[in-house]
């Protein structure tokens, strides 16, 4: 069975490395991008099965990346899991979730996040995208 490709887009190097290792231990093929622009380019070249996307990043934020992908007929089907920390730039978790729903993100997790929650959400989104029951 072919490994599912996951694109992980986050500017936090420690989080990215830990999450990449976790997902690879679950037999996913993980590609990393460190900002929104790089993430958008890699989404086009890698054609991942799922994208994990941080909201607050330099160059282009996660909302912008998600909106561009979801409105593109070639990439709009790819499930997107948004991640973000609530803080000065993000007033509340519900605000982030509402924004994500407006741009058609498939799921949302506030940071800090438990590693196993990421795995569970990834597996659920992949099952849904393959037409299986969640």
Region locations from a protein language model:
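Two-component/phosphorelay signaling modules centered on CheY-like receiver
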Residues: 13-31
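Helix N-cap/capping motif at the beta->alpha junctions
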Residues: 32-41, 62
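Active-site beta3 strand of CheY-like receiver
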Residues: 46-52
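A Lys-centered signature of the CheY-like receiver
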Residues: 111
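Short amphipathic alpha-helix used as the core "switch/output" element in two-component signaling
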Residues: 41, 63-76
């Amino acid at each position: 069975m072919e490994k599912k490709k996951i694109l992980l887009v986050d500017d936090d190097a420690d989080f990215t490395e830990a999450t990449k290792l976790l997902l690879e231990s679950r037999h996913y093929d993980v590609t990393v991008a460190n900002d929104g622009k790089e993430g958008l380019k890699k989404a086009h070249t890698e054609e991942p099965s799922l994208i994990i996307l941080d909201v607050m990043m330099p160059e282009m934020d996660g909302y912008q990346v998600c909106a561009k992908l979801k409105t593109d007929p070639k990439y709009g089907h790819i499930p997107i899991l948004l991640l973000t920390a609530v803080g000065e730039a993000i007033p509340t978790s519900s605000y982030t979730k509402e924004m994500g729903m407006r741009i058609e993100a498939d799921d949302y997790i506030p940071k800090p996040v438990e590693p196993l929650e990421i795995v569970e959400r990834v597996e659920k989104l992949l099952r849904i995208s393959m037409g299986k029951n969640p």
